[in-house]
């Protein structure tokens, strides 16, 4: 499909720079068939029924944004690195700026004057450079010591559409982490999960809705634009995910008994669909996935999707267009813009019922 079909105009003032407070006070646009209903996240339980199963991503965002200087040569330009993929105990793939200032063999010292990790400076050598500004960094520390050094020196890896407008601060360490965060490895938050609070979780449990955890370590590729003119030419980024045998069995039993699977975020959906067999049975999973979902895809595992509002021409807007229909989503986004919804990572959400899929009962007047 032509990628320009997924383009739309978004006023800059619609991009949220901070999350709603409390988190579950964010707006929620319910999209089912031709109907659009303006609600709030706190009303989510009313749209679900006993036996339904929520699936949340429990990945934890690391402090993947590092600042430092090239050292050992005549000039020492400032370098910014965003860690995007762990390769082994001491090596990471990273996006760096300015990439043109670096060659293989260069050394970078991360940390500012007076800001060092507990074990001292964190140095890295550039092992290799890629064509898209990515480099392979080999660090001076290994394993848990490296993890601690990154935590000491790094900043929250806010998306470019936020970081370009303000500097990340200490509040982002809390704001850019879901209440489910447990397994370190993400360099971007599974943002639909940011809306959840203990009170909302309790209300869902009282409704008889199950809550299930899976892990997909979100990579920085989630922010990368689609640069080709046709979706067939786009290469999707790979991310590591796991679904336990116990979780897979619980979801399969619930669906067999008439319960619906609600993915909290596109990361949970992509993982579930990657793990589903042709008949919709969810299998245990521990692997990378690079699934790229566009209109025409047949969904096998997920009935309902809670997700934020995404960038124009992004793989995530393509995914929601596949889930609910391109024209429906274009109309929903136009409605959201007109009604003052807040977009992207810190923004509001929409609750999508799969096109041609599950029934919905509106619990309140339009």
Swiss-Prot record:
Pathway: tRNA modification; tRNA-queuosine biosynthesis. Its EC number is 2.4.99.17. One of its GO terms (cellular component) is cytoplasm. It is found in: Cytoplasm. GO terms for molecular function: S-adenosylmethionine:tRNA ribosyltransferase-isomerase activity. It catalyses: 7-aminomethyl-7-carbaguanosine(34) in tRNA + S-adenosyl-L-methionine = epoxyqueuosine(34) in tRNA + adenine + L-methionine + 2 H(+). GO terms for biological process: queuosine biosynthetic process; tRNA wobble guanine modification. It comes from the Bacteria. Disulfide bonds: none annotated. Belongs to the QueA family. This is S-adenosylmethionine:tRNA ribosyltransferase-isomerase. The lineage of its organism: Bacteria, Pseudomonadati, Pseudomonadota, Alphaproteobacteria, Hyphomicrobiales.
């Amino acid at each position: 499909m032509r990628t320009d079909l997924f383009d739309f105009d978004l006023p800059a003032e619609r991009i949220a720079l901070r999350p709603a407070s409390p988190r579950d006070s964010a707006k929620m646009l319910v999209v089912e068939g031709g109907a659009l209903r303006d609600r709030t996240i706190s009303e989510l339980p009313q749209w679900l029924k006993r036996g339904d199963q929520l699936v949340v991503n429990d990945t934890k965002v690391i402090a993947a944004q590092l600042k430092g200087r090239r050292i050992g040569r005549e000039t020492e330009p400032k370098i910014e690195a965003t860690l995007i993929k762990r390769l082994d105990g001491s090596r990471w793939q990273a996006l760096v700026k300015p990439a043109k200032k670096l060659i293989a063999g260069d050394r970078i010292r991360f940390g500012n004057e007076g800001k060092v990790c507990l074990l001292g400076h964190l140095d890295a050598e550039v092992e290799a450079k890629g064509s898209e500004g990515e480099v392979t960094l080999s660090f001076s520390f290994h394993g848990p010591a490296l993890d601690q050094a990154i935590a000491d020196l790094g900043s929250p890896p806010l998306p470019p559409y936020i970081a370009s407008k303000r500097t990340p601060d200490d509040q982002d360490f809390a704001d850019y982490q879901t209440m489910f965060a447990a397994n370190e490895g993400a360099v971007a938050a599974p943002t639909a999960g940011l809306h959840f609070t203990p009170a909302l979780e309790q209300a869902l449990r009282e409704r008889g809705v199950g809550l299930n955890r899976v892990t997909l370590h979100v990579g920085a590729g989630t922010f990368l634009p689609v640069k080709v003119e046709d979706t067939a030419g786009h290469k999707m980024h790979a991310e590591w995910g796991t679904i336990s045998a116990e979780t897979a069995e619980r979801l399969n039993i619930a669906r067999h008994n008439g319960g619906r699977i609600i993915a909290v975020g596109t990361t949970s959906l992509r993982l579930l669909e990657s793990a589903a067999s042709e008949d919709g049975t969810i299998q245990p999973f521990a692997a990378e996935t690079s699934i790229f979902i566009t209109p025409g895809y047949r969904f096998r595992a997920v009935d309902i999707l809670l997700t934020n509002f995404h960038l124009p021409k992004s793989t995530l807007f393509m995914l929601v267009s596949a889930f609910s229909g391109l024209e429906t989503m274009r109309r929903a986004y136009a409605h959201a813009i007109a009604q003052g919804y807040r977009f992207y990572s810190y923004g509001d959400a929409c609750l999508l019922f799969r096109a041609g899929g599950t029934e919905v009962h509106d619990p309140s007047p339009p």
